[in-house]
């Protein structure tokens, strides 16, 4: 799916890729946004590493597909609520700024688009989707910009997968 306006990522609180949510047959979200890898991998980049946990995620996903609401990986309402954080004022302003940037870009006003992308990125620097969208317009610089941002991280590039039963 192509989500150029980031409608799905906003609604589901996706801040990086790949991320997933689990939606059951009744339309109920039973697991909120979390990293959704398919392989285990450790990528060393300079002094930092990106660690993915695909085996654990796929094991849980397969259990849910096989067992549905009886899966030990379906979250209780209380645990689900604990994991979904309310959006802060800055995050909501970042989302509005991002949408303005997309609008101005589509209308050909790249100066205003760039202004609002920069605002979105500064208001919610943890949302890598904003940065990636901005970098997509300068593909020759995207890798360099990604590496600079990655090297400045205090924490992890991806949140730790919390998929225990």
Describe every region a protein language model picked out.
Residues 30, 35-165:
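Non-globular targeting/processing and membrane-anchoring segments
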Residues 1-17, 21:
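Short, internal strand/loop/helix patches
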Residues 24:
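Acidic surface patches and DE-rich sequence motifs
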């Amino acid at each position: 799916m192509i989500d150029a306006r980031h409608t799905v990522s906003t609604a589901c609180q996706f801040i990086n890729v790949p991320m997933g949510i689990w939606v059951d047959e009744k339309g109920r979200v039973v697991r909120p946004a979390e990293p959704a890898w398919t392989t285990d991998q450790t990528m060393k980049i300079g002094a930092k590493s990106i660690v993915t946990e695909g085996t654990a995620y796929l094991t849980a996903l397969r259990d849910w597909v096989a067992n549905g609401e009886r899966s030990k990986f379906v979250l209780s309402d209380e645990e689900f609520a604990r994991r979904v954080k309310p959006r802060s004022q800055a995050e909501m302003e970042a989302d509005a700024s991002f949408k303005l940037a997309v609008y101005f870009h589509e209308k050909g006003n790249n100066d205003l688009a760039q202004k609002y992308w920069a605002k979105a990125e500064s208001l919610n620097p943890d949302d890598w989707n904003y940065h990636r969208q901005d970098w997509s317009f300068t593909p020759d610089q995207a890798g360099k910009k990604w590496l600079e941002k990655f090297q400045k991280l205090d924490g992890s590039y991806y949140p730790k997968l919390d998929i225990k039963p």
